[in-house]
Design a protein with these regions (language model features):
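Short, acidic/charged, Gly/Pro-enriched secondary-structure junctions
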Residues: 80-107, 124
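Helix-start/capping segments and mature chain N-termini
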Residues: 1-85, 110-295
Length: 295
């Protein structure tokens, strides 16, 4: 389905504390965020006109900025208010919110101590990240040739723009080969995550296994699913998982703000079933974000 390019849309964007016309929300070509990846961001879902886990996302945004040496010009309450304001202004009922923080253009070199910190928040209507028909039968992943960097080489626990370069490379490679997404291994060759989502496996006993987030983000949706599973009596084990262990699992799914709960039917040569446990977790998550009482 064709979508309107993001620089051609209409409405307002919250830009440095002002509601700015969408077409006028611009930055200079020579900004540090573009050239040196001095940029952090968040992705938030809107359900029935409310942002799910807004405060947690804002806390992570501020943590990411601090880790990148960026002093936020606004406090968390102001950013929360900005996120709520922009979805009302844009009349977003079921969509996406993108807060983004970047260094400006005062200095153009590796050093950036004098650069102004800019903040913007945009919102738009947005449906499923993956094709809904594919989600019903499970998406297919390859195994990326790129790996998540060692934790002592990057600020791995941030949502920083530069960390997604290898994700784009991995996803493009996967799509060129007919896959929907790509599984990334960590620096030691263990299962890590997909390009923009965490991963879970289900064994024959109904236990869930998920990698320890020690070189990639411990996703907000990931934590929600762990809580839902445990409250439903499902055992969850966080541990290192070798790729060859995937032959022992019956089910697999991804979690993320964009991905929500997405079943996986294949990773490379490993096959999985879209089992009842995964369907129930997806339903429970849907009920949670929509504030519905589980049946």
């Amino acid at each position: 389905m064709e979508t309107i390019p993001y620089d051609k849309r209409t409405g307002k964007i919250w830009f440095n504390a002002k509601l700015t016309d969408w077409k006028d929300a611009k930055v200079h070509l020579l900004n540090h965020g573009l050239h040196y990846a001095s940029c952090v961001f968040e992705g938030e879902r809107v359900y029935d006109g409310e942002i799910f886990k807004l405060e947690e996302h804002t806390e992570r945004l501020f943590y990411s900025a601090k880790r990148m040496g960026m002093e936020m010009p606004y406090n968390q309450d102001e950013i929360n208010k900005a996120c709520k304001e922009i979805i009302l202004t844009q009349k977003v009922r079921d969509g996406y919110v993108r807060p983004v923080v970047w260094r400006g253009s005062e200095m153009m070199a590796i050093s950036a101590q004098k650069n102004k910190i800019h903040v913007a928040v945009a919102a738009w209507e947005w449906g499923s990240y993956f094709d809904p028909k594919l989600k019903l039968k499970g998406i297919k992943l390859n195994i990326s040739s790129w790996r998540r960097p060692a934790p002592n080489s990057v600020p791995w626990d941030t949502k920083a723009a530069g960390l997604y370069m290898i994700c784009t490379l991995s996803k493009h490679e996967a799509e060129s080969k007919g896959y929907t997404d790509s599984l990334m291994l960590d620096h030691d060759g263990n299962v890590a995550e997909a390009t923009g989502a965490n991963i879970f496996f289900k064994d024959s006993n109904g236990t869930l296994h998920t990698p320890i987030p020690d070189s990639f983000l411990d996703g907000i949706t990931r934590r929600c699913i762990i809580d839902i599973a445990k409250s439903s009596g499902i055992k969850v084990i966080e541990r290192k998982i070798k790729p060859e262990e995937m032959s022992n699992f019956e089910g697999c799914f991804l979690t993320g703000t964009a991905a929500e709960v997405t079943p996986v039917s294949q990773i490379d040569n490993f096959s999985f079933n879209v089992c009842e446990v995964i369907k129930q977790l997806s339903k429970s998550y849907h009920n949670l974000v929509r504030k519905k009482v589980a049946a």
